[in-house]
C-alpha cells in the first residue's frame, strides 16, 4: 500500500521525468560533490606525478676559489666550542689552548688532525667519569652556498664515538631554523659507512621526489620533528667511511650547495677528477652524485643559510648512545671491558670513561678544505 502511494505521488525512482524539484536538487548536489572530489583527486595525482618527474636542471656554474683552509694555519680559521654539548654527549669539548696542550689538534704543512683524548682513564686525575676530552670547531666564516671540497685522509671511528663533518649555523639556540647539512657522519665502529643527511624545519621533504644518486635513500622527511629527528638521509655503503675508507687512503668529499639542490660526491684518493686537481672544479662533469637533495619539495635557499663548517668527535650522545646496544661494541662488564661503578653492561658512557686506549683510531685527518663560489 505504501509503495503504491509513493509511486502515485512521486513516480518510480527509475523515471527521472517523475521526480520532484526537491529530488532534482538533491541529485544535482550529489553529482556536483562527486565531480568536485574527482577533480580534487586528479589535481593531487597530477601534482604528485609532476613532483615525481620534476628535476632541477643543475646547469653548469663557473666557480672561483674563495677560501682555503690548509697547512699549519688550518685551525686558525676555526673557533673552538667550549660549552655544554647540545647533543648530550659524554664529552668535554676543550678550548684551543687545552686542545693544543693535550695534542688534540695540530697541523703540519700537509695535514691537520683533530682527535679524542687517549690519556685519561679510570686511575687518572682527573678521570673521565663525567666525560672524555674531545674537540669541536666551527669555521669563523659562514656560507650561504658554494662548492666545498674536503680532503679527508682519515675518518674517526671506535665504540662510543659519534664524529661528524657538517654545515650548520653556529648559533645552537636557533637550530634547525637555518638548516643542517651532514656531509660525513657515523657512530661507533662505523661499519655501515657514511651517512649524508639534511635536517630542517617544516616543508622540506625528499619523499616521492626524483633523485639521481648512487646512494640509498633512508627517511624522506627532513623536518626535525619527524622520525626522531632522523632527517632525510642517504646511506652510501661501508667503504665510504671507517676502516675501509682509511686503508684505501681516504679521499675527497665534494658538496655542491645551490638553490637547485644539494649534491654530494665522494672520490677516492686515486680517482680525484682532473678538474679538481687543476683548481677548476666542474660538478657537471663528475657523473651521478652519491647523494642528491633537489629543491623539488624543499626551498633550499630558504631552509639553508648562514652555515659554518663544523668538525667534531662527540662521544655517546643522543645518536651514539641509542645505537650502541645494537652495535658490535663490547656489552659485558666481565670479559669485554672493565666496568667501574656497577653501570649497565650496555652503557656507552661507561665504556668511554674507562677504555682510553680504544680511542687511538678516533681522529680526523684532513689535507685541505677549499670553498668555491660563483663569481
PLM region spans:
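Short, structured patches in soluble enzyme cores that scaffold and shape functional sites
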Residues: 154, 185, 200-202, 256, ...
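Glycine-aromatic-enriched beta-strand/loop faces of beta-sandwich-type recognition domains
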Residues: 176-245, 314-321, 334, 343-350
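Intrinsically disordered, low-complexity terminal tails of fungal membrane proteins
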Residues: 1-23
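Conserved His + Asp/Glu catalytic blocks
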Residues: 293
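Low-complexity, Ser/Thr/Pro/Gly-rich disordered linker/stalk regions
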Residues: 16-35, 41-189, 269-270, 277-289, ...
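Localized edge beta-strand/strand-to-loop motifs within extracellular or lumenal beta-rich domains
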Residues: 247-263, 267-270
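Generic recognition of flexible, low-complexity loop/linker segments
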Residues: 240-243, 250-253, 297-299, 355-357
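Short, glycine/acidic-rich beta->alpha junctions
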Residues: 142, 157, 173, 236-237, ...
Amino acid at each position: 500500500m505504501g509503495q503504491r502511494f509513493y509511486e502515485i505521488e512521486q513516480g518510480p525512482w527509475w523515471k527521472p521525468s517523475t521526480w520532484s524539484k526537491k529530488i532534482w536538487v538533491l541529485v544535482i548536489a550529489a553529482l556536483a560533490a562527486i565531480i568536485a572530489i574527482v577533480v580534487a583527486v586528479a589535481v593531487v595525482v597530477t601534482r604528485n606525478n609532476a613532483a615525481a618527474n620534476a628535476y632541477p636542471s643543475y646547469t653548469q656554474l663557473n666557480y672561483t676559489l674563495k677560501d682555503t683552509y690548509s697547512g699549519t694555519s688550518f685551525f686558525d680559521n676555526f673557533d673552538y666550542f667550549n660549552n655544554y654539548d647540545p647533543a648530550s654527549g659524554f664529552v668535554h669539548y676543550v678550548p684551543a689552548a687545552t686542545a693544543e696542550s693535550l695534542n688534540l689538534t695540530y697541523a703540519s704543512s700537509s695535514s691537520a688532525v683533530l682527535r679524542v683524548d687517549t690519556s685519561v682513564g679510570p686511575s687518572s686525575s682527573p678521570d673521565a667519569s663525567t666525560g672524555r676530552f674531545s674537540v669541536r670547531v666551527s669555521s669563523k666564516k659562514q656560507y650561504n652556498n658554494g662548492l666545498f671540497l674536503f680532503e679527508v685522509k682519515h675518518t674517526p671511528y671506535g665504540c662510543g664515538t659519534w664524529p661528524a663533518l657538517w654545515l650548520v649555523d653556529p648559533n645552537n639556540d636557533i637550530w634547525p631554523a637555518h638548516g643542517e647539512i651532514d656531509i660525513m657522519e657515523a657512530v661507533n665502529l662505523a661499519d655501515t659507512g657514511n651517512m649524508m643527511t639534511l635536517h630542517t624545519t617544516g616543508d622540506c621533504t625528499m619523499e616521492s621526489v626524483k633523485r639521481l644518486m648512487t646512494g640509498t635513500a633512508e627517511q624522506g622527511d627532513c623536518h626535525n620533528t619527524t622520525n626522531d629527528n632522523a632527517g632525510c638521509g642517504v646511506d652510501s655503503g661501508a667503504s665510504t667511511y671507517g676502516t675501509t675508507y682509511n686503508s684505501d687512503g681516504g679521499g675527497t668529499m665534494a658538496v655542491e650547495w645551490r638553490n637547485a639542490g644539494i649534491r654530494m660526491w665522494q672520490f677516492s684518493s686515486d680517482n680525484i677528477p682532473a678538474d679538481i686537481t687543476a683548481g677548476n672544479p666542474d660538478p657537471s662533469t663528475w657523473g651521478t652524485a652519491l647523494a642528491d637533495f633537489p629543491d623539488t619539495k624543499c626551498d633550499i635557499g630558504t631552509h639553508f643559510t648562514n652555515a659554518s663548517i663544523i668538525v667534531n668527535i662527540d662521544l655517546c650522545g643522543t645518536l651514539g648512545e641509542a645505537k650502541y646496544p645494537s652495535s658490535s661494541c663490547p656489552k659485558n662488564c666481565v670479559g669485554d671491558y672493565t666496568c667501574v661503578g656497577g653501570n649497565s653492561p650496555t652503557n656507552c658512557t661507561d665504556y668511554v670513561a674507562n677504555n682510553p686506549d680504544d680511542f687511538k683510531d678516533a681522529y680526523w685527518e684532513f689535507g685541505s678544505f677549499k670553498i668555491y663560489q660563483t663569481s
